[in-house]
Amino acid sequence: MIHAGQSSSLTPAASPPHRRGKHKIFIGMAPGVGKTYRMLEEGQQLKQEGFDVVIGLLETHGREETAQKAIGLEQVPLRTMIWQGRSLLEMDTGAILARSPQLALVDELAHTNIPGAEREKRYQDVELILAAGIDVYSTINIQHLESLNDLVYKISGVVVRERVPDRLLDEADEVVVVDVTPETLQERLQEGKIYAQDKINQALQNFFKRQNLVALRELALREVANNIEENSRHDQQTNHCAVHERILVCISTYPNSIQLLRRGGRIASQMNGRLFVLFVAPTNQFLSKVEALHVETCQHLTQEFEGEFIRQESDNVVGAIAQVATTYRITQIVLGESRRSRWHLLIKGSIIQRLMRCLPTVDLHIIANG
């Protein structure tokens, strides 16, 4: 359950070793709002109170104030890895587990590990640490949430490649929004507190435009507020609650399938419903390597959203969708706009029109392409 801005959720050392650690996430609208500084500040306070606190991974990005705030906190040595002939540093999850502190501070939750590491993403390392009974404080920016990827692109024009599943926010014991005004953040940028001098003008003209920051700030505040409301609503429900929404996303080999899947994932999350994703493959027709990889990506993304991926072979797309909708008791279907020609639509009708006739009690969400 998420509690924005509550006191420390740290668990005393006397707790049984088999318990899961507690996770507190510091989230903000953009780099430079002060997430890492706030995390270190709370870590220092807990150390003074007698808790065993270590830094598992810290990214100061050359910010002197942040580095100063880490002084006095034990830092677990990083692990050196060789990749493409270069020596690079990564968080040493094994060393953190062996050290077994009460609390580990881990920066940049969305980071992608070096190829060859035991786990692909840093958040997976954090989940391992939590499973060992160690509490974790971590940081992330709102644009790294998987389901918001398309929306962030529309706001900023930036494609965010490092992403985490939304469930991390849902499963966190506490989420704290580290908030500053867009004007304050732009001032920090101009003072060289976020990026090097040679990158400041470019940042101000792109991601750090005032209108972008206003929209991202609203997005961060609204997302956490929605999570609090959803968790509160979930706590009030009993095991004998009414019928849950069951959302079916229909994907194809077109690139917009990723957008459809994210939209369906958000609908399922907001309605506390179950997510199903259907791919109907034509019979006696092989997918190209690119198409097969695309479908595999959709399947992986479905797992990130904790949904169920369904693959069927059929030349009757409408019939296959209707059958799955009936079998899985689907209440809502998410589809993309039809790409067929006007002549085809005039002769056979659109998939949407035919589905409306087949499934009159199911709500259809038609998502525009682009």
UniProtKB/Swiss-Prot annotation:
Enzyme Commission numbers on file: 2.7.3.-
Record family assignment: In the C-terminal section; belongs to the universal stress protein A family.
InterPro entries assigned: Histidine_kinase_KdpD, P-loop_NTPase, Rossmann-like_a/b/a_fold, Sig_transdc_His_kinase_KdpD_N
Organism domain of life: Bacteria
Species of the source: Synechocystis sp. (strain ATCC 27184 / PCC 6803 / Kazusa)
Residues covered by region (Disordered): 1-22
Name the record gives this protein: Putative sensor protein KdpD
Record keywords: Kinase, Transferase, Two-component regulatory system
Job of this protein: Member of the two-component regulatory system KdpD/KdpE involved in the regulation of the kdp operon. KdpD may function as a membrane-associated protein kinase that phosphorylates KdpE in response to environmental signals.
Primary gene name: kdpD
Disulfide bonds: none
